[in-house]
Amino acid sequence: VQLTFDADVEAFRAEFVGFLTEHLPTQAQAAERPSSTSHVPEWSRRWQRLQFDHGWLLPGNPPEFGGRNANILQQFVHREELSRRRIYHCFNPQGVGIIAASLLSFGTEEQKRRWAVPILRADKTASLGMSEPGAGSDLAGLRTKAELVGDEFVVNGQKVWTSGAHDADVILTFVRTDPNAPRHKGISALLIPTDSPGLVRRPFPSVYDRDELDFNEVFFNDVRVPADNLVGPLNGGWRVANGSLGHERTLMWMAFANRLEQLLEDYRPSDEVNADHYATIVMDYYALRLLGSAALGKAASGDVDVAALSVLKVFGSEAEQSALRHALDAAGADGLRDKMLTAPYNPYAPDLFTASWFARYISSYAGTIAGGTSEIQRNIIAQRVLGLPSR
């Protein structure tokens, strides 16, 4: 199912499809996703640089930063074509889509030159340091502290669930710089190079792929960071965190919708009971598309509805989890043994049996946790949509 837009947006889509037709490498189509940013094949770096040079890496960026000043609807059709065709986009999506975006919005010209451009051109990789023990979905509860001493910050504390930190050149780290300020107002954002003395990274496996080390604990022991690495104003980290994720959240629902669409294409039950389950997935898919297109329309007019995005996050992540549960039930024991348990998890795989429904089902639980748990999102919905008290 493809939404149709005005002629200028569809012309933008056609231009991007033409670029893909001419330049897309076969490896990106075959979805040979690199398993780690430290073992990235050269074709992947070349493909990312080619997109940067042609303005297709992040079309919403200015041309000097790999884009073409595209509006939100044009960015939508760009993302839609990538997802619908199951195309490998870039090897460091967090660095490209969040850290570099943060620097373009809040960074200095020197920070953009030193960090944003190399990240976008695949010369450097970046990770995001938010979650901490005891402050997973609650950024305002973070305790990692940074004290300004002369022209340096001295950082002490710990982060956890830091994706890709073991391979990253820099971590955009959120720290507490004013312990006496209200929780949301004493936070700052720092660019901390991973080769800084006192910074220790400890990768650990996830339940859905124990051979791939992606998550990390990161420890800061008197790590000295130049004051010039402050992103945005001192104690203004809350605004940096929310601003850098703004458009990403607006388009996040597409990932859930496209994975549901892939499931509908690959899962075709023949019996009546599972046909009912299939119908439920179809209804969830269309409901998600309608909710998402409504939020997209608001964003196009400059109105980013945070509560509506929370609804999309909860509904999309839980609909995907439910759909995969139905698919596993339909496959039965033989399907689990013969076709699913042996396949590695690969979200870009050309079909869901290759991707392993079982591995994808396990990983779907991360979708209800990462980026703010369903419980946190329901609190936002209760307070901002329903007007309920916080206690």
Model-derived features: where do they sit?
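A structural signal for short hydrophobic beta-strand segments in well-ordered beta-sheet cores
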Residues: T144-E147
